[in-house]
Amino acid sequence: MTGISIGVVRRPNEADVATIRSLAEAAERADGVAPLPEQVLLHLKRSGDADADADTDAWHFVARRLSPQGSELTGYAFLDKSNAEEGPTAEVVVLPDARRQGVGGALLDALRMKVRRGDKPIRVWSHGALPAAAALAAKRGLEPVRELWVMSRPLADVPPAPTPPDGIRIATFRPGVDDEAWVEVNARAFAHHPEQGSMTVQDLRDRMAEPWFDPEGFFLAWRGAKLAGFHWTKVHDHSAYGDGPVGEVYVVGLDPAEQGHGLGRTLTEVGLRHLHDRGLGEVILYVEADNTPAVAVYTKLGFTRRSADVMYQL
């Protein structure tokens, strides 16, 4: 006899973390898209640190298939309830060989049970807008409420880096020196973006500790002593985006006072040229599907829609 068991913990143990990572890698190979975003992977990485994320209302859900031979970890979900204004968000991934066997549905049920009556509805991401996820969403009556596009372009014909606007100096990020200034401007630039705008100095330093971090690809635009904007690039050494390394416009942000003067495009082009000069052949970026002005800007810069992530509401 077999069944599904769901465990809910604040901090998964080391063995489960390793298995969850392997599960996510198997899903990425099968689907061609990473099932878990960077923030969840950082939570998993810090799970052994009792002091990390102490003020974060986050939970890990581990699904196991039970049989007379033992148990096998076949699914995982992450629930973040920290943002009271936006409501809880979740990520779900199921081992490819265990799909269409009730694991995804069991995880959704467990997520629902973790939210108190009166809380805002849970919103669940589907990365890559996969048919299996859409079928489960339709079966459970989930409604799509947000769509995030992945856009890409080749880097072969990127022009030289442009001259900055008058009064602007562009320099690379100095770890330990520019941290606080960047966090302050990032918060203002993304005041209405719950994930990006809430980043703390510790969140920044967590990313600086990752193997992919390169300050030479992190560009800051200064107006005198004041930070006006930034373009942080990233390189995926191996990923679902291609056989070789792929660049990313990781995040571009401007102080609100600097918007509308072309600085965002300048910073974007500086970063694209940097990725080109590193010998990369392609670059991607993420943009809200309903952000028509941003989509128009990126389209003019040669980007086209490659795939989409869809958020469903439970």
Curated annotation (Swiss-Prot):
User: What is the reaction catalyzed?
Assistant: 1D-myo-inositol 2-(L-cysteinylamino)-2-deoxy-alpha-D-glucopyranoside + acetyl-CoA = mycothiol + CoA + H(+)
**Biological processes, Gene Ontology terms:** mycothiol biosynthetic process
Tell me its EC number(s), please: 2.3.1.189
Sites binding acetyl-CoA 2 sit at V252, G253, L254, Q259, G260, H261, G262, L263, G264, R265
Q: Which residues bind 1D-myo-inositol 2-(L-cysteinylamino)-2-deoxy-alpha-D-glucopyranoside?
A: E38, E195, K234, E248, Y286
On whether Transferase is a keyword of this UniProt record, the answer is yes
Q: What class of enzyme is it?
A: transferase
Q: Which InterPro entries match?
A: Acyl_CoA_acyltransferase, Bact_Acetyltransf, GNAT_dom, Mycothiol_AcTrfase
Q: What are the alphabetically sorted keywords of the record?
A: Acyltransferase, Repeat, Transferase
Q: Where is the N-acetyltransferase domain?
A: 18-156, 168-314
Entries under CDD domains matching the protein: NAT_SF
> From what superkingdom does this record's organism come?
Bacteria
Q: Where does acetyl-CoA 1 bind?
A: V92, V93, V94
Quote one Gene Ontology molecular function term: mycothiol synthase activity
Q: Which family does it belong to?
A: Belongs to the acetyltransferase family. MshD subfamily.
| HAMAP family hit by this protein | MshD
Summarizing the function annotation, the protein's role is: Catalyzes the transfer of acetyl from acetyl-CoA to desacetylmycothiol (Cys-GlcN-Ins) to form mycothiol.
Assembly and partners are described as: Monomer.
Q: Report what the protein is called.
A: Mycothiol acetyltransferase
Annotated source species: Catenulispora acidiphila (strain DSM 44928 / JCM 14897 / NBRC 102108 / NRRL B-24433 / ID139908)
